[in-house]
């Protein structure tokens, strides 16, 4: 991750990313009709598609979309991720990726590159090279989880970002839990999410939760 970030930061800052409140088919048709050098970067929702490309091309696309009353919003990013503008670092990134000793997942994992259950390919350098250039299929990934009956979603990160997109999907009676929140005590947030998991019937390893603290059980 750090090597990829370092390589990206050495790229010229000529790109932009734009969130579009339209389906991916509509967005792709407009891009192809106007021969714009723009790539689909993420498919987050049926009406939330992110594109990535050179700033001038993205500006042209934004104007075309606004004429059709399609809402858009620029993403606050340094570079045009998941696009052809990442190609200049592909060779060096592949060299780094080939040095890693990969292990195949021991638990089922959904690939946001394919939107399907990850295969052994995820433990290869070629997979992560594709991940650098190809779109994130968040919608397909979440749809698959819904088909499998998954209803508990925990975002592991410094702040909840994906939970907001997940809540827009038609997943009923779901639990959407952050691990951390800005301006919220870390331990308090973890305990709140643990409490929700417990009341939802999830088996909690309380010995692991309490291992760093002196405690005793009280009869209720």
Pin down the residues of each PLM region:
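Flexible, low-complexity segments
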Residues: 20-21, 129-220
């Amino acid at each position: 991750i750090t090597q990829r970030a370092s390589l990206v930061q050495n790229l010229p800052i000529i790109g932009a990313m734009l969130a579009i409140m339209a389906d991916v088919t509509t967005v792709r048709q407009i891009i192809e009709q106007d021969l714009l050098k723009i790539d689909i970067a993420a498919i987050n929702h049926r009406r939330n598609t992110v594109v990535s490309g050179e700033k001038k091309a993205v500006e042209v696309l934004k104007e075309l979309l606004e004429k059709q009353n399609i809402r858009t919003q620029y993403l606050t990013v340094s570079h045009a991720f998941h696009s052809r503008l990442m190609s200049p670092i592909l060779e060096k990134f592949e060299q780094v990726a080939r040095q890693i000793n990969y292990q195949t997942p021991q638990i089922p994992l959904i690939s946001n590159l394919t939107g399907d259950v990850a295969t052994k390919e995820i433990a290869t350098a070629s997979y992560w090279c594709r991940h650098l250039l190809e779109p994130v299929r968040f919608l397909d990934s979440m749809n698959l989880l819904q088909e499998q009956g998954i209803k508990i979603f925990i975002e592991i990160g410094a702040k909840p970002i994906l939970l907001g997109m997940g809540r827009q999907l038609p997943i009923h009676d779901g639990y959407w839990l952050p691990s951390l929140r800005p301006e919220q005590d870390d331990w308090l947030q973890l305990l709140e999410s643990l409490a929700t998991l417990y009341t939802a019937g999830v088996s909690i390893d309380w010995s692991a939760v309490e291992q760093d603290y002196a405690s005793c059980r009280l009869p209720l």
